[in-house]
Amino acid sequence: MLVVNVSRTWPLVPGDMSAEESVLGDWAALNEAKLHQYGDAIIAVADGTVVAAYDIQGWERLENGRVRFAGRLSGRWAPLIGMPSPVTWTQGAARPVRYL
């Protein structure tokens, strides 16, 4: 499972960015081996709370090296929504992705 920090992009104002774009959007510096090992689900965290959960159906590496996921809302991980994040980030942390 990947846990991503979407605090900067989570759609607080409808129309700015969809939840799907925020969570599945383009992520930098993801290792191929770790994608294969942990790439079954993606949990999104905003301000310390789980806000979305997706089952990953696939992914593509873009020309700029970033990874874009394809996925669907997860029934299995949906109960985590509204719960505290399973991982923590320190303020100013550069890596918005954690592997769990």
Name these PLM-found stretches.
Residues M1-G39, V45-V50, R76-L100:
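Compositionally biased, charged N-terminal/linker segments
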